[in-house]
Regions:
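RNA-interacting cores
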Residues: 1-253
Length: 253
């Protein structure tokens, strides 16, 4: 794969599961990776990564016998050996607390799956308006506090930084341009509080529309299209390896 991708790892338990907290799910995933590919686990823990090269989210419904983990990968080369070992072994078991779950399938199609080669992002035409759906609580760090608001600069400056960390072709753009030329024109959001196993985190969920001002340069429109598509894989805001900031692109014009 020559670009970011997202799959859903499906696991089965022998007895009904209680709804796990995000920290437990994240720990279970890292434990599975450590058993499958120790080198990858060490890389994912490396402090040299300002942004983690993956996101992880537990998809509903929660409880029951099945657990579905949505994994998006921003650095395909890092995970190449992991998938080779997965195929040879038929998957790796997941230990969630004291419960072992068996791998059932790797789902590569569906609403939260997909892939886009890096060059294709650059082929997207510039847009002036975009709508995004935030499926899980999303929050941004500003100073010493979390800010659960879909402010244009916080969202797109964060996506720009993630893009430049993941892609071999950086996007040269001043993040301040998002403050100057991009406006939040419509929003149907609500605040949710989630206990992640360590702290209560507040974030917004819902649908938000952004629109460029008439005098916005063309390169801002191209960045808006590129980063909106990239958000599906990169997630938005903080704690994206713990299920927060799950984003879907809805439409643009």
């Amino acid at each position: 794969m020559n670009g970011p991708y997202a799959v859903v790892l499906r696991y089965r338990a022998r007895q009904p599961l209680a709804a796990p907290v995000p920290e437990a799910v994240h720990a279970a995933f890292l434990g599975m990776v450590r058993r499958a590919d120790p080198a990858l686990a060490a890389t994912l823990h490396s402090p040299q990564h300002r942004f983690r090269p993956y996101t992880l989210a537990l998809l509903g419904p929660r409880g029951g016998l099945e657990l579905r983990l949505r994994l998006s990968v921003l650095a395909p080369d890092l995970f190449r050996e992991f998938w080779k070992r997965w195929e040879r072994r038929g998957g790796f078991a997941l230990r969630l607390g004291r419960t072992w779950l068996s791998p059932a399938a790797v789902q590569k199609s569906g609403p939260w799956c997909g892939e886009i080669p890096w060059p294709r992002f650059w082929e997207l035409p510039p847009v002036r308006r975009v709508a995004l759906a935030f499926a899980t609580p999303t929050t941004f760090r500003q100073g010493d506090v979390d800010l659960p608001l879909p402010l244009p600069k916080l969202l797109f400056a964060g996506l720009l930084a993630k893009w430049n960390a993941a892609s071999s072709r950086p996007l040269s753009l001043d993040p301040e341009l998002f403050s100057r030329f991009l406006a939040l024109t419509e929003g149907r959001v609500r605040i949710q509080s989630v206990w992640d196993g360590r702290a209560t985190i507040r974030g917004f969920v819902g649908v938000v529309e952004f629109r460029l001002k008439k005098d916005a340069p063309k390169e801002v429109g191209q960045a808006l299209a590129l980063l909106s598509a990239f958000a599906f894989f990169a997630g938005a805001g903080r704690h994206t390896t713990h299920g927060f900031g799950l984003v879907r692109f809805l439409h643009a014009s």
